Amino acid sequence: MIRLIEKESILELIKKSFLFLITLFTISLIGYGDRFFIESRFGLAAVGDYFFYINIFLFPFSLFQTYIGFKEIVIFKNKYDLSILKTKLILLLKFSFIFSVLLFSFFLLIEYFGIYDLKIKSNLEIVLALIFLGNIKIIYSLLSSVIGAHSDNSMLYNINLKSICSILLLAPVIYYFSYSVFLVIIYIIILWVIRCLIWYNQIQKI
């Protein structure tokens, strides 16, 4: 009996690990696939500029995203309900907005005082889109913490299925209608928003 239980537990662990692997694959696809697409569609110069603005206006959000993810998963493991999540989401949105304003203002001042020409005005739509994407990814990190703390195989299966379907549905649009780097970022934002909605929908069932 003990051996059967152990065998079942191992199989469940393998199944859950595989589902998490698919989750990581889909997030890597929407998190890093844009670089390869921009390079193939617009050339090395365009992807070089894109990397430059990502490092300045998106990477700072990624640092907070990682911190929030590790911190909150421990908290949600011990205590969780939907009202706590909603409160944290509101606080995080406020923090993220303030941080966005400070980040944009800081680099705008750097350019204004002639410290470094970031060409913000000529690439304003890309800069603002990346900052908005950073906000979405911070919100996602909180939702992901809940999933990481309380997900089961059924939940992971539903999340992965819906995520893959959203990528497959939007992929032709991205391929045929990406006329600029800005539009590529907009499509990536849409994918992240869809992912957040999928996560939140599943979280409500916990």
Descriptions of predicted regions:
Residues 1, 46, 106, 113, ...:
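Membrane-interface helix-loop junctions in multi-pass transport and translocation proteins
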Residues 1-8, 66-72, 142-146, 173-178, ...:
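C-terminal transmembrane helix end/exit motif
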Residues 1-29, 74-84, 203-206:
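Interhelical loop/hinge segments that connect adjacent transmembrane helices in multipass membrane
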Residues 12-16, 20, 38-58, 121-124, ...:
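Interfacial/gating helices of multi-pass transporter permease domains
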Residues 13-28, 32, 36, 54-63, ...:
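Residue-level signature of transmembrane alpha-helical cores of multipass secondary-active transporters
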Residues 53, 57-81, 148-149:
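Helix-loop junctions and terminal segments of transmembrane helices
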Residues 78-107, 154-160, 203:
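Membrane-water interface segments that mark the loop-to-transmembrane alpha-helix transition
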Residues 134-161, 203:
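Membrane-interface junctions at transmembrane-helix termini in multi-pass inner-membrane proteins
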